[in-house]
Design a protein with these regions (language model features):
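Residues at the starts of beta-strands that form the adenosine-phosphate
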Residues: 63-64, 114, 223
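Short, acidic, metal-binding catalytic loop of nucleotide-sugar glycosyltransferases
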Residues: 51-63, 83
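Short beta-strand-to-loop acidic/aromatic patch adjacent to the donor-nucleotide binding site
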Residues: 112-123
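Active-site-proximal specificity loops/subdomain of glycosyltransferases
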Residues: 68-113
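A conserved hydrophobic helix/loop-capping motif in glycosyltransferases and polysaccharide synthases
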Residues: 35-43, 58
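Cell-envelope/extracellular polymer assembly enzymes that use nucleotide-activated donors
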Residues: 33-37, 64, 212
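C-terminal catalytic/acceptor-binding lobe
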Residues: 1-19, 29-31, 47-50, 200-271
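Conserved catalytic core of nucleotide-sugar-dependent glycosyltransferases
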Residues: 123-198
């Protein structure tokens, strides 16, 4: 988290905390036919309610918000999170510990629904869900990402390091990778049926759920689009950035090795 982001983070955190839990629990009649699915880790349990509040306090509500936690966290749920549970928001538990749990179980439970995933350490803009849903209406069969990269190879066909995967939009939609932090919308049946094979996911991409789901989109023949009208940038929640899969994957070049494993196993062709 950058120093200049701290004042904004504190301001929006206090604003969200001032909202009454019972007001956020009620599902409005004009809600969108969307399920928001995310996960969290033990070190963020006392902060994730801020993210949930920002998701519940949207210009257009989702019909359901599911937070997936490991079953060992069941007896450690803070009151700040419990008071938000209601008609819209619920907490579910899983034996999984990997980040894949943000989507895999929701795909199993709601295969015919639009699912939007997000991260647990950010405050989301008031128009975040409404905007990504409008993008979905323009491309109803495509996966929509608010933030994307281009999987890139050099002239000899060698995969470039993740840091060199640019944000430029290529003509070849196959190379577009949606990044989870800012939000990804998955229409029904946009991923291969084997997307929920957690054992295979953990074998090939144990620390890169975005790469796993990208491979599943390719197998299904689903295009990925960069949102052209996305809300203002994410606001990091103060005190949540100490543990990050993103940093580990980039610093140790794990994204590269995991994508190679996926591409080799599934014979993925991005040309």
């Amino acid at each position: 988290m950058k120093v200049k982001e701290i004042p904004g983070s504190v301001y929006h955190t206090l604003k969200l905390k001032s909202l009454k839990g019972k007001d956020l629990q009620t599902l409005r009649a004009d809600h969108l036919p969307v399920i928001i699915s995310l996960t969290s880790i033990p070190s963020r349990l006392h902060k994730v309610h801020i993210t949930i509040r920002s998701i519940l306090y949207q210009s257009k509500q989702a019909k359901k918000v599911i937070l997936w936690l490991n079953e060992n966290d069941k007896n450690h749920i803070p009151k700040s999170l419990k008071i938000l549970c209601g008609e819209t928001f619920e907490i579910r538990y899983t034996p999984l510990t990997s980040s894949h749990k943000k989507l895999i179980h929701t795909l199993e439970l709601y295969p015919d629904d639009i699912i939007v995933t997000c991260d647990d350490d950010f405050i989301y803009n008031y128009y975040w869900l409404e905007k990504i849903y409008k993008q979905h209406l323009q491309h109803p069969k495509a996966i929509i990402g608010n933030f994307t990269r281009q999987i890139q190879y050099d002239a000899d066909g060698n995969l470039l390091q993740y840091k060199k995967w640019t944000h430029q939009q290529p003509d070849n939609k196959k190379t577009i990778l949606a990044i989870g932090a800012e939000g990804i919308l998955y229409p029904p049946k946009s991923l291969s049926p084997i997307a929920t094979d957690i054992n295979l996911a953990l074998e090939l991409a144990p620390k890169a759920d975005d790469l796993w789901f990208k491979a599943m989109a390719l197998l299904q023949g689903t295009e990925v689009f960069q949102a052209t009208d996305k809300p203002k940038g994410l606001i990091p929640i103060f005190g949540t950035q100490k543990v990050s899969l993103k940093k580990e994957n980039i610093d140790k070049n794990k994204n590269l090795t995991q994508w190679k494993a996926l591409a080799d196993h599934f014979k993925l062709d991005l040309k």
